[in-house]
């Protein structure tokens, strides 16, 4: 009976150790798969947009950036400003505003509005109050 119990305990300890060792690998694979899918879905949505829609989205983002430059940073945006911010560059309605490619490590990571824990679990967060990532003189996009 003692051998049977010790065998069960040894098996549980082994499985626990194996789970702890495999968790980082499985977690990285899972996140990479979902990030790749998010980038692919976003790219498809952008390809479906006509040139006029793309230009309008870019113009709205540039206008937002210009407003930040002229008004200065605000620590507590109004509800209207929050709604506007969340709608900018959100082509597929998921909160994703673009993606960043890092060729050295062959990685494409989605960029989402905000820096809440839920956002940072799935991609890169854009800090509200900084310029949107569309470029331009005097703009400074901050990603987390």
Residue ranges and their predicted role:
Residues 1-14:
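N-terminal Sec-pathway targeting helices
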